[in-house]
Amino acid sequence: MQTNELYLVIYWNSLLGERISKVISNREDLFDYLNQNFIVSDKDTIDNVIDFGEPIRINDNSYYYVKQVSFIQGKQTVRPEDYVYILANKLDKSYEFTTVFSDKDVLEEYLKDEYPELSTYQRKRLIAGNYSDDLDVGYVRLYK
């Protein structure tokens, strides 16, 4: 297994909470995406969004921000438009997105190693989208 980094573009709304908008594989594509989709063309501003998590405000109740997370890849190659799995710690009213996985087998191995208290049944339910008290798994298509 290989470990790299991916970028999550996360949308936050005061009523709906957080959701992942895009998963992008490299900084150049992220820069282009932010430049094309938001009224932010200043390189320093985009660098601050990427490097320091500075939010891009849409209005008083919603914004986007970027988070860089670990990506653990199995043997298969992940291409744009393939689904990747995202592990998140559930907090009071939000999520802390921690790691992205190339496929469910890699995710299951990770859960087995890092969360040995989870039974096989609990791991399979979690991967299938049935969250536990502390963890949640989602999946989204890789943008680029």
Model-derived segments and spans:
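Non-transmembrane, interaction-prone segments in cytosolic or luminal domains
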Residues: 7-9, 26-27, 92, 103, ...
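Short aromatic-glycine-(Arg/Gly/Cys) micro-motifs in beta-strand/loop hairpins
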Residues: 2-19, 76-96
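Short, mixed-charge low-complexity intrinsically disordered segments
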Residues: 18-19, 36-82, 95-96, 111-144
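A short, exposed loop/beta-hairpin motif centered on an aromatic-Gly-Thr core
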Residues: 17-26, 93-105
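Ordered, small/hydrophobic-rich secondary-structure cores
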Residues: 1-45
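Short amphipathic alpha-helices within nucleic acid-binding modules
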Residues: 30-33, 106-111
